[in-house]
């Protein structure tokens, strides 16, 4: 695989630097940090450490990553715009209701990275590769959980994945977030957008 990319969570000093800069520019502002799932990174803990002694900073674990975290942040921002006098407790109470409604999952096009990361045995990798099996990974309680297996081409599996997520309950069709990684075919990406519209998503 060549050189595997690595990540590291932000340190308390990183957060303190940003919080102090914002506070210097806008001393009357309250900072609300909607954090990446704390199960997957140390960032939320670092934020809480940095918030100590800074009574204008509040940090909350969104229990999501990527598009899920973004959706929680965007909906919270809309609430604040509509309710400018809301307290932090009221805002976070609303944020919790958003988190309870967000669904997030993905289907990897290639299991090689799961294998390289130690999340898949050689036998399981070989069997899944030969049978064209692709797992559905969902974010549940902040954790990555394999919930279902799809079989066939990536196009077929991607559509089955969307059907699986839509079947989970009452869906808000006003918006959907589709995230793609580098290397995904334009054909597959275009098909997912068309299929989402066919299902009624705006």
Which positions does each model-derived feature cover?
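Mixed-charge interfacial surface used for oligomerization/domain docking
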Residues: 2, 20, 25, 29-30, ...
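N-terminal glycine-rich anion-binding loop in soluble enzyme alpha/beta folds
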Residues: 1-16, 20
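A short beta-strand-to-loop transition that corresponds to the Sensor-1 phosphate-sensing loop
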Residues: 37
């Amino acid at each position: 695989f060549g050189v595997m990319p690595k990540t590291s969570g932000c340190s308390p000093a990183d957060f303190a630097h940003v919080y102090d800069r914002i506070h210097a520019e806008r001393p009357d502002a309250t900072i609300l940090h909607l954090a990446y799932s704390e199960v997957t990174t140390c960032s939320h803990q670092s934020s809480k450490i940095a918030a100590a002694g800074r009574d204008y900073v509040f940090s909350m674990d969104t229990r999501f990553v990527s598009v899920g975290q973004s959706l929680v942040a965007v909906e919270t921002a809309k609430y604040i715009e509509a309710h400018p006098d809301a307290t932090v407790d009221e805002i976070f109470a609303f944020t919790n209701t958003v988190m309870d409604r967000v669904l997030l999952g993905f289907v990897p096009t290639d299991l090689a990275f799961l294998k390289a990361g130690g999340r898949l045995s050689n036998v399981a990798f070989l069997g899944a590769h030969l049978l064209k099996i692709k797992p559905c990974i969902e974010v549940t309680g902040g954790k990555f959980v394999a919930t279902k297996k799809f079989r066939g081409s990536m196009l077929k599996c991607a559509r089955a994945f969307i059907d699986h997520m839509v079947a989970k309950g009452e869906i808000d069709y006003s918006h959907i977030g589709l995230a793609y990684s580098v290397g995904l075919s334009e054909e597959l990406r275009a098909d997912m957008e068309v299929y989402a519209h066919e299902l009624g998503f705006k």
